Amino acid sequence: MRRVMWPLACAMALCGPAAAVPARAPDLSTTDAVLRWINGYRAKPDVARVPAAVRTLSQLGALRDSETSAVYVGFVAGIIGSYPQLAGELIEKILPIKAEDHWLIVRAVAYSGLPNWRDVLNRFASRMPSRQLMIEKYTTGKLPTLDAIAFEASPTPLDKLKGYTASVGDFFTGHKTPEPVRLEATSEVLDTLWGYYFATGSYGPVERILHMLPWSKDRQDTDKLTVGSMAKFTLASNAARVRRKSTVPGRLATSWRSSARRPSCGLLGLSSDE
């Protein structure tokens, strides 16, 4: 939890309202320029420029650290998931990035939500030889996808029944049922969810971020406190945009707005009014 959500913070701080994105071809020559473009993508989707943006990030060395690159992973995952018919073409055009950055393609496909994401990864496995093991781990379930985020909650009666049934089965078979692989809700995952939201404008990522809000009051777990506070801050910074997004259900929009507090927006000079 030592890192700062720098890419995500920059994406918010460097941009004005999404509606202000200019009509001319965007500048994608620097990391800051790409962040601005990602932040305004929902106002004017331009999927054809996504590969160029990723190639720029790779050339500038912005993809070396998986933690600080999480917002890019989420963005590419959201794009691939939104355009299943173009997935192969998009990946083809992103592949020329540095071989050491191919991890981003693998994770983005695994996080995309495509029904056939495993087939897509296997199709391109030979083109990413240094990521064969990573691909194998994702496709066999040894690494979690974005759908496997772990949110602790009190077990329901059905959960308890399933647990009891599994325990009885383990007793008679002598084999312990393996626990499903879960994705811990960290600040890296938070960045990834925001990247997915920037690409799609869908409320699914926001709903998951809202699940992290209670952690902002957890004084017993420093990691959760950090993630919860980051979730609260980023939600507050984006609260004004909810009024312009019809894809966010009323109950989520209300929760999102209620998370906005003026003191939180003072960090990094951000304003919830935009």
Residue ranges and their predicted role:
Residues 1-7:
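Bacterial N-terminal signal peptides that target proteins for export
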Residues 21-274:
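Non-catalytic all-alpha helical scaffold/repeat segments
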Residues 7-15:
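Bacterial N-terminal signal peptides
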